[in-house]
A protein has these predicted regions:
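A charged, aromatic-enriched C-terminal amphipathic alpha-helix characteristic of glycosyltransferases
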Residues: 109, 129-153
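Short, well-ordered loop/turn elements at secondary-structure boundaries
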Residues: 21, 47-52, 70-75, 97-98, ...
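Generic secondary-structure transition motif, activating predominantly at the C-termini of alpha-helices
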Residues: 11-17, 92, 122, 126, ...
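Acidic donor-binding loop of glycosyltransferase active sites
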Residues: 44-61
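A structural signal for well-ordered alpha-helical segments within the folded catalytic domains
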Residues: 41, 48, 112-120, 147-151
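Catalytic binding pocket for nucleotide-activated donors in carbohydrate/polymer assembly enzymes
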Residues: 56-134
Length: 153
């Protein structure tokens, strides 16, 4: 790989996964089918290992990845430019990450605000009462987005 925008930006930002770095970056540029030669795990097995997921979509007609995340009881952050985010915003009694999904407003002109909102959500999740979600089963309210969208086959 001679040129990769993600790797170039990580290098520019000094994110080199040093021992002193509190944030570690995992960048796996492949399809997680269990036979990728890097992680050798399926996508859903990877999702299950997360405490929180972030999908800051710029545009997705629906956005299955945040839905899949909450279906596996992993709280998620998404935007209102994904159909899933718009749908979550339409629900009554949905109050952000407490209910499993934080939807951040995103437009062509608010990149910095989106980045700050994601940072603030992750910080609040990791140091606040939400941090307990990592150690305890996800709240099982039938009104949460994950449980509203369940279907039986």
């Amino acid at each position: 790989m001679t040129h990769d925008q993600v790797l170039d930006m990580l290098k520019y930002l000094g994110m080199d996964n040093g021992p002193e770095d509190k944030v570690k970056v995992i960048f796996v540029p492949c399809y997680l089918d269990g036979k990728d030669g890097i992680l050798n795990k399926h996508y859903y097995d990877i999702v299950l290992g997360h405490d929180l997921s972030v999908y800051p979509s710029y545009y997705e007609p629906w956005g299955y990845t945040p839905l899949e995340s909450v279906a596996f009881k992993v709280p998620t952050v998404t935007t209102d430019l994904a159909g899933f985010g718009l749908w979550v915003n339409s629900l009554k009694n949905q109050h952000g990450i407490n209910d499993g999904v934080e939807v951040i407003h995103r437009s062509d002109y608010n990149y910095s605000e989106v980045a700050d909102a994601i940072k603030d959500t992750i910080t609040a999740f990791s140091v606040g009462p939400h941090a307990l979600l990592a150690a305890k089963p996800f709240h099982h309210s039938r009104h949460l987005p994950a449980f509203i969208f369940i279907w039986d086959l």
